[in-house]
Amino acid sequence: MDLTNMGKAAKGAAFELATASTAQKNQALAIIADELEANSAAILAANAKDIELGREAGLTDALLDRLLLNEERLTGIANDVRNVISLNDPVGSEIDSKVLENGMSLSRRRVPLGVVGVIYEARPNVTIDIAALCLKTGNASILRGGKETFFSNMELVKVIQSALAKANLPAASVQYIEKPDRELVSQLLKLDDYVDMIIPRGGAGLHKMCKENSTIPVIIGGFGISHIFVDESADLEKSLNVVENSKVQRPSACNSLDTLLVHEKVAAKFLPMIVERMSDKVTFVAEPKAKALMAQATQIRDAVEGDFDTEWLSYTLGVKVVADVKEAIDHMRVHNASHSDAIMTNSLINSELFINSVGSAAVYVNAATRFTDGAQFGLGAEVAVSTQKLHARGPMGLEELTSYKWVGKANYLARS
């Protein structure tokens, strides 16, 4: 399979999408949302095949949870698309403007990026999220999902293609690479004549491979160790609720809690509270000081090298006792704090130190790490959570899928 023709078709579609009206794009999105619900039986049947094959292949519970669709999740995906409809279309909006001394009116106007290539793994919802956000912003997209989601994605792509046809938008606006051959990923990463940005959504290995092999700009994100530090001044009862929510609400999510750091002055009180609340679900991986205070835990083991660098994506939690906020920050710097990190504290000084010192895409004071999400941030769905510093950072919504062009208007002005 040669992806060159797919790239050419996407580039052609991108030119048409760039001038599509907001009403036309919203029409396509409304059809996608409605048909997701109307075709739920077929979509869920296809997803059941993927789940069955995933179990046979020995996928972890975390991966199976990411792969799973049910009526509730499908309705949520449809509603996310409807939320995108309600958002302002950034394309064509002015960022700023001024009048130069020579009389020229100069402005910066938002424009689509062009063609976005997205490589992702066992998350069928990403197929719809990407398609919706790219369509809203006038971008064409080339999608490559994992083999684990093959049957689910085939049904979802049918919904998208039906919507494009009914809204009179080019079929190549959203294309899907059906074959799971990794060689096709390598091809996609070299289509710099046609593709303007690559977004990998998966583990560290996928991000590394894209970064090292792509001739197209790559957005790195989604991977990072998420921490919560419980300071000595924190309200421990309220902190307990936040820690539990961050860990167990959806442990397979990239913004779920990986490592809990506790100030040594409150560890003797707080860690037994954690054990009592969470030990029926969570396996603790603890360094010696923490383990000594968690004697009642039913599932606990000693932390070994590499544990605090692990994104668990499961009901496993690293635990460590630290001397103060500075040691907590130092730990985060060493152990890949780049995604979502939080401090529980009633100290303004410590909260500001944390905000200014932790280099993550999203930092929180007295809030769960689970909030790093496009919908939670009011962005609609998201194409990714970027953990790099250039172009976009954190949940990438509509504006992050645009660039800008300079627009100069004058009265037949020539440069002197």
UniProtKB/Swiss-Prot annotation:
Pathways per UniProt: Amino-acid biosynthesis; L-proline biosynthesis; L-glutamate 5-semialdehyde from L-glutamate: step 2/2
A cellular component term, taken from the record's GO annotations: cytoplasm
Localisation per UniProt entry: Cytoplasm
Catalytic activity: L-glutamate 5-semialdehyde + phosphate + NADP(+) = L-glutamyl 5-phosphate + NADPH + H(+)
Main location: cytoplasm
Keywords in alphabetical order: Amino-acid biosynthesis, Cytoplasm, NADP, Oxidoreductase, Proline biosynthesis
Gene3D superfamilies documented for this protein: Aldehyde Dehydrogenase, Chain A, domain 1, Aldehyde Dehydrogenase, Chain A, domain 2
InterPro entries given in the database record: Ald_DH/histidinol_DH (IPR016161), Ald_DH_C (IPR016163), Ald_DH_N (IPR016162), Aldehyde_DH_dom (IPR015590), G-glutamylP_reductase_CS (IPR020593), Glu-5-SA_DH (IPR012134), GPR_dom (IPR000965)
Residue ranges of the TM segments: none
The keyword Signal is assigned to this record: no
Enzyme class name: oxidoreductase
Highest taxon above the source species: Bacteria
Entry-linked Pfam families: Aldedh
Gene Ontology MF: a single term: glutamate-5-semialdehyde dehydrogenase activity
Function, in words: Catalyzes the NADPH-dependent reduction of L-glutamate 5-phosphate into L-glutamate 5-semialdehyde and phosphate. The product spontaneously undergoes cyclization to form 1-pyrroline-5-carboxylate.
NCBIfam families for this protein: PRK00197.1 (NF001221), proA (TIGR00407)
Family to which this protein belongs: Belongs to the gamma-glutamyl phosphate reductase family.
Protein name: Gamma-glutamyl phosphate reductase
Natural source organism: Vibrio parahaemolyticus serotype O3:K6 (strain RIMD 2210633)
